[in-house]
């Protein structure tokens, strides 16, 4: 196999929390005002953005040519955000949900798109206090992008399991490793993408969704893997935001290698193993429910296997691509940590009282936290 190493980018959505109680607080305007006053985010190699609610804030990295650049962007941006948040009596927390009772008086970000979403989707939009991690991999050719998307669907269950970081919701243990997934699944355009025969087939689907009023335009597709309209990339959206920088770095490297593998398989004409949509949907739900703590469904073989074995199948498949990047070590460290000590959801459940859980997440959000 021969590989080209594509550029990548990453987005992380963070919680803004009260330093005493750990509860979400709507201080995004104040934090962004402080960042602008201090000269903006250019030196952090990222863009800082609003999200749906004012207790959320998002970073989007510049285009990165290496995992070292990803690490630098995440580290510098988190430090900048933490400093700006603390100057406004706020802490930054990186996890898929906040464990404490959800806000009853949270302010919506004043943006036409967000207001339209809330007007249409009502309570599921008002309750959308969830925080994800999105990875972009360069993809100039959208026809190729469709086939890569088809080939990457098989990995969605294990990607869901390894990034699970949201066991608590509204003050209770939900029983899920990723309850964020279940909250997000309520949205009609969320979930795994279908298999598309071609770019024309994909575009026909988009046209049908617009025609029937399901979406305003293509940018309202929120599938777990999608082709964004603004940038020439393929975007992976299934993950909870992870707490430690090194987890995100390893995950970005994993996604890049998955895309490289899919491109190589497409160029070789390797047949795609058909996956039934119902099997894939169940496999993803099962991964969100149990994380790495139970057996998972391999959607290609339709067999239930240990989670560690499904992760091993992924690592074996992408090994040639990882070696081609020269940056296998962060990905291998991430995989080893998952086997040794579990996911972010597992760490949260070992954290004791919910206020202590938030405090631990806040502490690990600081870029100095290392894998252990």
Swiss-Prot record:
Gene Ontology MF term list: ATP binding; glutamate-cysteine ligase activity; ligase activity, forming carbon-nitrogen bonds
Pfam family of the protein (one): GCS2
Catalytic activity: L-cysteine + L-glutamate + ATP = gamma-L-glutamyl-L-cysteine + ADP + phosphate + H(+)
EC number of this enzyme: 6.3.2.2
Alphabetically ordered keywords of this record: ATP-binding, Ligase, Nucleotide-binding
Biological process annotations from GO: modified amino acid biosynthetic process
Root EC class: ligase
Organism domain of life: Bacteria
Family: Belongs to the glutamate--cysteine ligase type 2 family. YbdK subfamily.
Classification via PANTHER family: GLUTAMATE--CYSTEINE LIGASE 2-RELATED
Listed name of the protein: Putative glutamate--cysteine ligase 2
The organism's taxonomic lineage, starting at the top: Bacteria, Pseudomonadati, Planctomycetota, Planctomycetia, Pirellulales
């Amino acid at each position: 196999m021969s590989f080209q190493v594509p550029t990548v980018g990453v987005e992380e959505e963070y919680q803004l929390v009260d330093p005493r109680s750990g509860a979400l607080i709507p201080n995004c305007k104040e934090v962004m005002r402080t960042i602008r006053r201090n000269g903006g985010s250019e030196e952090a190699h990222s863009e800082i953005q609003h999200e749906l609610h004012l207790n959320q804030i998002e970073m989007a990295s510049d285009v990165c040519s290496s995992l070292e650049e990803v690490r630098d962007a995440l580290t510098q941006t988190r430090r900048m955000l933490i400093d700006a948040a603390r100057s406004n009596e706020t802490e930054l927390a990186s996890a898929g949900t906040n464990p404490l009772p959800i806000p009853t008086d949270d302010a919506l970000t004043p943006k036409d798109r967000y207001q339209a979403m809330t007007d249409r989707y009502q309570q599921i939009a008002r309750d959308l206090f969830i925080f994800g991690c999105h990875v972009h991999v360069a993809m100039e050719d959208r026809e190729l992008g469709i086939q890569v998307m088809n080939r990457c669907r098989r990995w969605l269950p294990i990607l869901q399991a390894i990034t699970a970081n949201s066991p608590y919701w509204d003050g209770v243990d939900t029983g899920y490793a990723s309850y964020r997934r279940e909250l997000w699944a309520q949205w009609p355009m969320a979930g795994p993408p279908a298999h598309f025969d071609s770019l024309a087939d994909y575009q026909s689907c988009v046209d049908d969704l617009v025609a029937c009023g399901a979406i305003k335009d293509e940018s309202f597709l929120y599938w777990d893997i999608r082709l964004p309209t603004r940038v020439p990339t393929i975007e992976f959206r299934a993950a909870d935001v992870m707490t430690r920088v090194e987890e995100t770095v390893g995950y970005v490297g994993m996604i890049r290698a998955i895309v490289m593998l899919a491109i190589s398989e497409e160029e070789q004409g390797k047949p795609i193993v058909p996956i039934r949509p119902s099997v894939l949907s169940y496999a993803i739900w099962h991964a969100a429910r149990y994380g790495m703590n139970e057996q998972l469904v391999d959607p290609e073989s339709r067999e239930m296997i240990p989670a560690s074995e499904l992760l091993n199948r992924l690592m074996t498949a992408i090994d040639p691509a990882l070696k081609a990047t020269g940056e296998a070590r962060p990905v291998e460290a991430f995989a080893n940590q998952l086997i040794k000590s579990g996911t972010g959801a597992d760490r949260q459940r070992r954290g004791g009282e919910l206020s202590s859980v938030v405090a631990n997440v806040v502490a690990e959000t600081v870029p100095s936290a290392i894998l252990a």
